[in-house]
């Protein structure tokens, strides 16, 4: 039995480096203010230093997305994520909400909005499918940086 599988497939899009550069140069620097506001509201985190890593830009076609309920720090052996930062890159579609199970809340995508939430099971969520268009989303995760003394 093989322990992996190689798929030969043609993707329906190409990586656009100009878009990646735009995210790096225009969007990511603007996250500091929303992150500061989040840390001010969640006082237990104020004294910690954070590192945001692994920014992913997702193209979610009509009907697509990750519809299963999940949370962001549940993988054994993975870097423990403290909170999630999502930036909605467009809003020219219906549906496509980020839905939170225990909060009984749906966040509709509004272009330019930043959604920050805890990575733990308390904020189990899913991405509902976009209807009538494609959703673009940038996601990054924050981890607590250890003290220099450790």
Q: What do the predicted segments below correspond to?
A:
Residues 1-114, 122-150:
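Fe(II)/2-oxoglutarate oxygenase catalytic core
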């Amino acid at each position: 039995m093989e322990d992996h599988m190689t798929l030969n497939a043609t993707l329906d899009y190409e990586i656009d480096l100009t878009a990646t550069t735009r995210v790096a140069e225009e969007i990511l620097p603007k996250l500091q203010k929303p992150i500061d506001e989040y840390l001010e509201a969640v006082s237990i985190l104020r004294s910690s230093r954070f590192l945001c890593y692994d920014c992913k830009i997702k193209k979610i076609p009509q009907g697509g997305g990750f519809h299963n309920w999940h949370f962001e720090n549940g993988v054994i052996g993975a870097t423990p994520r403290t909170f999630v930062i999502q930036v909605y890159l467009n809003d020219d579609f219906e549906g496509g909400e980020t839905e939170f199970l225990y909060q009984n809340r749906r966040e509709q995508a509004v272009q330019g909005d930043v959604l920050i939430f805890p990575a733990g099971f308390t904020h189990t969520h899913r991405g509902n499918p976009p209807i009538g268009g494609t959703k673009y989303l940038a996601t990054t995760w924050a981890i607590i940086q250890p003290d220099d003394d450790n």
